[in-house]
From Swiss-Prot:
Protein name: UPF0284 protein Tery_1555
CDD domains: DMB-PRT_CobT
NCBIfam families: nicotinate mononucleotide-dependent phosphoribosyltransferase CobT, PRK04447.1-6
Family in the record: Belongs to the UPF0284 family.
MF GO annotations: nicotinate-nucleotide-dimethylbenzimidazole phosphoribosyltransferase activity
Family annotation (SUPFAM superfamilies): Nicotinate mononucleotide:5,6-dimethylbenzimidazole phosphoribosyltransferase (CobT) (SSF52733)
Domain of life from the UniProt record: Bacteria
């Protein structure tokens, strides 16, 4: 149920080390106006819908099924929110949940830990966030990384994200770091919109005065210019937690960008971390997306173990879940990492994973 795609021995060692352990799950929430560009993301059918995707996802993640949610899960072109996968797993396995608000326009309807960040402007501005905000988020992320490590004790921490438009800010950071990511990233679209993403990213890097062919020497300025608030929080959190416990960065393109950022923070700012304790965990739909090259991207970054759950919805009786097999949605809210955990912690197989998700989805569509 788990396949390791890169740095196989390190990835297998990590899996063996944490087999049978119950982790804790932290989901880092953020917003970027980049996600409102028409057509940039399918995480919400319209830009108006995408303003509230994160709020709806975390309300569902925390409260579960409700007759009248304040923020209902948004309509999608096809598929169903990945939060359904995450929720089914963390509830069934009783995995502790921490929600971190790194920067949202609207106050969440459920309890979150406010990190004192801010939502990001569109990356085309070349000034997505103030440098002081990035510096603060790195510090507070590191603080909470240490706290989560203490809570996890001998186990590991899953760090997921909820940022609409986040694969585009990820591409911007990757190119700014000098990583050959063109044509390799993923999106929530069935066919990745590489040309649109690249045009947006080039505009932002040019506005900020960064040359995408040269690795940046000041990573915090890069994230402030073209990034989003989640990235720097997870980087600080993951690096700090890795000094004591295992860390799974639960996501695809976005978490590979965070890992690349960690490497540069360690090199340029001498931040301490233990990279042997960190893996990136995602879904098969991301790792094997024929319209991107996730494995190639991980190899470009270097030294990062990339693994994915082999969960599939081929045999699902719900067309919304079957849509994942046609390339829709793919990942989000840490669903891939949580599916990996279901097998690692309780040895769940395909049948058990599918049943947990379908049981929740059946109740969800009954209430709709």
């Amino acid at each position: 149920m788990i396949r390791v795609y890169t740095q196989r021995q390190q990835g297998k060692n990590w899996l063996q080390r944490y087999q049978g352990y119950k982790p804790i799950f932290g989901c880092i929430l953020g917003f970027t106006d980049t996600g409102l560009i028409p057509g940039i993301s399918a995480a919400g059918a319209t830009p108006q819908d995408r303003q509230y995707t994160c709020l709806a996802d975390i309300e569902f993640l925390y409260n579960g099924l409700q007759l009248q949610p304040q923020y209902p899960l948004p309509p999608l072109e096809a598929g169903a929110s990945p939060v359904l996968i995450t929720k089914a797993i963390i509830d069934t396995l009783n995995i502790p949940l921490y929600l971190f608000n790194a920067g949202l326009y609207h106050k969440p309807t459920v309890p979150t830990i406010d990190l004192g960040g801010a939502p990001a402007r569109c990356l085309t501005s070349g000034h997505a966030l103030d440098l002081a905000t990035i510096q603060h988020l790195l510090e507070v992320g590191s603080y909470w990384g240490r706290k989560l490590a203490d809570e996890a004790k001998d186990s590991y921490v899953i760090l997921g994200e909820c940022v609409v438009g986040g694969t585009t800010t990820a591409l911007a950071v990757l190119l700014g770091l000098g990583i050959g990511a063109i044509g390799k990233v993923n999106s929530s679209h069935p066919q990745c919109n590489h040309d649109q993403k690249l045009a947006v990213v080039h505009q932002g890097l040019q506005e900020a005065g960064f040359h995408s062919a040269l690795p940046v020497s000041e990573p915090l300025k890069l994230v402030a210019a073209v990034g989003d608030p989640m990235q720097i929080v997870v980087a600080g959190m993951g690096m700090a937690a890795s000094l004591k416990v295992g860390v799974m960065l639960a996501g695809g393109t976005q978490m590979l960008a965070v890992y690349a950022l960690m490497q540069v923070l360690a090199e340029k700012l001498s931040l301490l971390w233990r990279p042997e304790n960190i893996v990136v965990g995602t879904t098969r739909w991301v790792a094997e997306d024929p319209t991107g090259d996730t494995v190639g991207l991980a190899q470009e970054i270097g030294c990062v173990p990339l693994m994915a759950t082999q969960l599939h919805f081929d045999e699902s009786c719900y067309p919304q879940l079957q849509a994942y097999e046609r390339g829709y949605v793919k990942e989000g809210v840490g669903c891939g990492g949580c599916a990996i955990t279901a097998h690692l912690y309780r040895n769940w197989n395909q049948t058990q994973l599918l049943k947990a998700v379908e049981d929740l989805f059946a109740s969800f569509i009954f209430l709709e």
